[in-house]
Amino acid sequence: MKEYKGKLNISKARIGIVISRFNETITKNLLEGSLDELERYGISTQNLPVAWVPGAFEIPLIAKQMALSGEFDAIICLGAIIRGTTPHFDYVASQSAAGILNVSLEINLPVVFGILTTDTVEQAMERSGVKMGNKGREAVQTAIEMIDLTDQLSLLRNHPHSSTANNTSVCK
């Protein structure tokens, strides 16, 4: 059996971040955690593009524009959606997730879902690093791992004996 696992050892990754201004106190914590984690892995944040959008619902469009630029190995999407008293939470959370997934699959690029979906502000604060873990840090780790894994699999795809390299398809 041949296993493929992404490794957390990329220091030259080109990463862009899309972040929601809504719930900015929380999203700034996520961004800070992401930037700290990027530096920890040796990825400079000095010229790192960070695109601020009004809310989580707008994240997929800007993530797609960044992905289509060809300038990035991965896009990290950060936001915080907190349940209120209306069904708005459900729509925004599900459509933001679906949009981010669609961008990743359409563009064939890691687009990481780093959007908190919580019932309370307290839960969001906890997950943004105020009391314990920071999901922004985890999003960076996911991006780095997925960059490495997709690189490994693209090398496999370009191998002379692969069905893709021979212009044949396993699925008919």
From Swiss-Prot:
What taxonomic classification does the UniProt entry list for its organism? Answer: Bacteria, Pseudomonadati, Chlamydiota, Chlamydiia, Parachlamydiales
The UniProt entry's sequence similarity note says: Belongs to the DMRL synthase family.
Query: Part of which pathway?
Result: Cofactor biosynthesis; riboflavin biosynthesis; riboflavin from 2-hydroxy-3-oxobutyl phosphate and 5-amino-6-(D-ribitylamino)uracil: step 1/2
Q: Which is a Gene Ontology cellular component entry for this protein?
A: riboflavin synthase complex
Q: Which reaction does it catalyse?
A: (2S)-2-hydroxy-3-oxobutyl phosphate + 5-amino-6-(D-ribitylamino)uracil = 6,7-dimethyl-8-(1-D-ribityl)lumazine + phosphate + 2 H2O + H(+)
| Name of protein | 6,7-dimethyl-8-ribityllumazine synthase
List positions binding (2S)-2-hydroxy-3-oxobutyl phosphate: 78-79, 127
**Known SUPFAM superfamilies for this protein?**
Lumazine synthase (SSF52121)
GO MF terms here are:
6,7-dimethyl-8-ribityllumazine synthase activity
Name the enzyme group at the top EC level: transferase
| Pfam families xref list | DMRL_synthase
Q: Among the record's GO biological process terms, what is one? A: riboflavin biosynthetic process
Which UniProt key words apply to this protein? Riboflavin biosynthesis, Transferase
Binding residues for 5-amino-6-(D-ribitylamino)uracil: 22, 56-58, 80-82, 113
UniProt organism field: Protochlamydia amoebophila (strain UWE25)
CDD domains with a match to the protein in the record = Lumazine_synthase-I
- State which Enzyme Commission number(s) the record gives: 2.5.1.78
